[in-house]
Amino acid sequence: MIERMWDPEVRVSGSLATVWTPYDFYNGAQFSHCGVDVVTMIHNGERWEIKSLDFNRQQPPTCELHPDGPPGG
């Protein structure tokens, strides 16, 4: 299984941060789906901790595929 993310948008406000990034997902060489991952993080004073990971699953053209094309290609 291969999940590739690209062009993350990171926003930070004090101890709160989010990362929004498109992704595509392959099962071996076979395309499965694509969508968006959203990660919410909190800084605990020492390090960033992931508090939630949310995502959606879509099919093109609703979502975009990785700009480099299929993995290994």
Protein language model features and the residues they cover:
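Short beta-strand edge/turn micro-motifs at domain boundaries
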Residues: 36-64
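Short, low-complexity N-terminal intrinsically disordered segments enriched in polar/charged residues
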Residues: 67-73
